[in-house]
Amino acid sequence: QKFLYVQRHHKLDALKRILEINNEGVIIFVRTKLLTTSLAEALENAGHSVAVLNGDIPQNQRENTVDRLKKGFINILVATDVAARGLDVERIKLVINYDFPFDKETYTHRIGRTGRAGRSGEAILFVNHREKHFLRNLENSTRNKIEELEIPNNKIINEKRMGKLISN
């Protein structure tokens, strides 16, 4: 579990940098249905395979979306907390809390989507200056220290790109 200190107006750029390094099997949690669609659109425009999961989507379409994620047809899911409970997709290696979860239960259920059944996984929490005290409260209530993560710089991103080119 890590947190990324980022101002609200830099969140999308920070997210894109993180996804340059890790973009397969990702759930990005946001607070509103509107943000699920606008963020997914921005990520699609950046070349990512993305789907949306929120309360406005009919159950059969949600199940289809989860199935596509499981099979690798999509790599990134932008979701409201409707997806937090009960979702078990082996491919999920990264959970990003794009919007801060203000209670321990929501946080626990969100990050529980990765690293299930002994698998490895990572959770990143975006925090702005107004949310720093909530971060400390979250650490206290979960009794876990959440370490700070730096936004990936160009060198790290380029090394990852080179590694992908070499492996292909």
Question: Which residues does each predicted region cover?
Answer:
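Conserved helicase RecA-like core
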Residues: 1-168
